[in-house]
């Protein structure tokens, strides 16, 4: 097992705690309250509850750090050089439709640079994380990107529409965070998406 920083450990604990709520709510989809943020952007009470748990856990450990979260926006605190960046459910549409492919993502930005981040799949209990100068890991095992060098042997993933003029093999999964984690772990060979925010 590799050694991880205190900040990454805090993020892992926060994501594990929030995942319990998501798993419970995922099992009771018909009871979820859903509202629309935009034309293709939904928020559930599960998003809000999970985000609150994550923020509470992060603030408990680092009360002065600022926060950028999907549901609450920017919350500047005493320390404006360190920002937690939180998406409590990446893949909300999947979550809403009972598709077990969504994730919690948390990153820490320090002095305008991401220094560590994680993507946690609560359904599969898969944790992907990376830390500056320490590498990328999946459930405590170092990961590497695919070594395929022939484009026709590759499998790509996208979250958006794609003109497939090159006839490339690709998938659309509905969870950009997991798509990128899967590229890091060599499950997919590449990821692209327009208008990712």
Regions found by a protein language model. Give the residues of each.
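N-terminal subdomain of lithium-sensitive/metallo-dependent phosphomonoesterases centered on the IMPase/IPPase/PAP
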Residues: 1-89
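Residue-level signal for inorganic ion chemistry
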Residues: 18, 22, 47, 58, ...
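Generic detector of well-ordered alpha-helical packing
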Residues: 48, 71, 88-91, 95, ...
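DPxDG-like acidic metal-binding loop motif
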Residues: 78-137
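A structural micro-motif at secondary-structure boundaries
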Residues: 138-142
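An extended, acidic
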Residues: 144-197
């Amino acid at each position: 097992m590799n050694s991880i920083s205190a900040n990454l450990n805090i993020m892992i604990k926060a994501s594990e705690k929030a995942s319990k709520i998501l798993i419970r709510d995922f099992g009771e989809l018909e009871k979820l309250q859903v509202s629309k943020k935009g034309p293709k952007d939904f928020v559930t009470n599960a998003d809000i509850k999970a985000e609150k748990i994550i923020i509470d856990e992060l603030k408990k450990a680092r009360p002065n750090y600022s926060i950028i979260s999907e549901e609450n926006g920017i919350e500047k605190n005493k320390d404006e050089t360190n920002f937690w960046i939180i998406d409590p459910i990446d893949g909300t549409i999947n979550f809403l439709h009972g598709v077990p492919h969504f994730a919690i993502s948390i990153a820490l930005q320090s002095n305008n640079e991401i220094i560590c981040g994680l993507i946690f799949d609560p359904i599969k209990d898969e944790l992907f994380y990376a830390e500056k100068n320490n590498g990328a890991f999946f459930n405590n095992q170092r990961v590497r990107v695919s070594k395929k060098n022939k484009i026709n042997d590759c499998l790509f993933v996208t979250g958006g529409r794609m003109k497939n003029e090159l006839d490339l093999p690709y998938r659309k999964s509905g969870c950009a965070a997991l798509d990128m984690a899967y590229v890091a772990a060599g499950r997919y060979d590449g990821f692209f998406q327009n208008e990712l925010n």
